[in-house]
Amino acid sequence: MTSPSLLRGFGAYAPERILTNADIESMVETTDEWITTRTGIRQRHVVAPGQTTSDLAVEAARAALADAALDTADITHVLVATCTPDASCPNTACIVARKLGMTGVMALDCNAACSGFLYGLELAQGIVAARPASRVLLVAAEALSLRCNWKDRTTCVLFGDGAGATVVTADVDATQGTAVLEDSIVTSDGSLGDLLTIGGGTANPYAIGDSVGEEYFVRMQGRDVFKHAVRSMTQVCNDLLARNGFTTEDVDLVIPHQANLRIIEAVGDRLGFASEKVFVNVHDFGNTSAASIPLALADARAQGRIRPGMRVLLTTFGGGFTWGAALLRF
């Protein structure tokens, strides 16, 4: 990357309603011990009745704008990463822009499942590189609780709802809440897509009067996804570090996609990072898909885990399959 983009300001939002493992015990045949042992998740935030993905996105966007000391009038593009849009049309970015009172902006959705934030970051960087005066409001938001099969204990225990946001810009004089995007890699392998799906598109359309089948909800081959996720995130991180001449010693903190604790620990171990260098908040939020990394970034900053001068390695893996990694310098 010859002219690095800046991430200016970070914001996050999680719905007020919390669903604990004890709550889920009354819904499906499972226990708190079973969930915690296998996933590390103790609770997850879920939307209230009538609350949508765009509602979560708006709250995170407002927080990011405030952190960046920017106003909606400063934004030229709105990019929303989600696999749980409010509707097929209009796109969620247009809805977010409307709710924020914004007109005259380019508004676009990006769907790369759990990799959505890093894919969105790649797109935003391209926009800023082509049009240096641009300021891209990048929001990743999911309401996966609305697409979970609450009778399937293998998936419903994993997911939560939330949103995270940042502003991508080339403002070299910006200092407040700023990180430099040093480099990133995103990639995919569509041949493995059937291992993790959310149905309901034109390949499986519904007619009026049809009952909703299991294929409408999240379906996942957990063991296969685990294997590919760990291998892919490890490899892409090694590739990114190598092409920048870095080793693990040059990284101060790793923020992996918060899929589950076993995946997070396996990736950290294979990369050779001490556990204290790997940020984890999956126990409080569950897997929030595209929102996972920006939510974790905001959380890590709030906890004082990220300080000026630190280099942070992000890595993710999602349906598609899609995966990637990015290096930020704060």
Curated annotation (Swiss-Prot):
Ranges that cross the membrane: none
**Residue ranges of the region described as ACP-binding:** 258-262
From the record, what ranges are coiled-coil? none
Which GO annotations describe the biological process of this protein? fatty acid biosynthetic process; secondary metabolite biosynthetic process
InterPro entries attached to this UniProt entry: ACP_syn_III_C (IPR013747), ACP_syn_III_N (IPR013751), FabH (IPR004655), Thiolase-like (IPR016039)
One function term, GO molecular function aspect: beta-ketoacyl-acyl-carrier-protein synthase III activity
- List GO terms (cellular component aspect): cytoplasm
Q: What is its main location?
A: cytoplasm
Q: What class of enzyme is it?
A: transferase
Give the pathway.
Lipid metabolism; fatty acid biosynthesis
EC numbers: 2.3.1.180
Which residues participate directly in catalysis?
114, 257, 287
Self-association state and partner proteins as the record states? Homodimer.
What domain notes does the record hold? Answer: The last Arg residue of the ACP-binding site is essential for the weak association between ACP/AcpP and FabH.
Q: Which NCBIfam families match?
A: fabH, PRK09352.1
The text of the family note is: Belongs to the thiolase-like superfamily. FabH family.
Put simply, this protein is called Beta-ketoacyl-[acyl-carrier-protein] synthase III
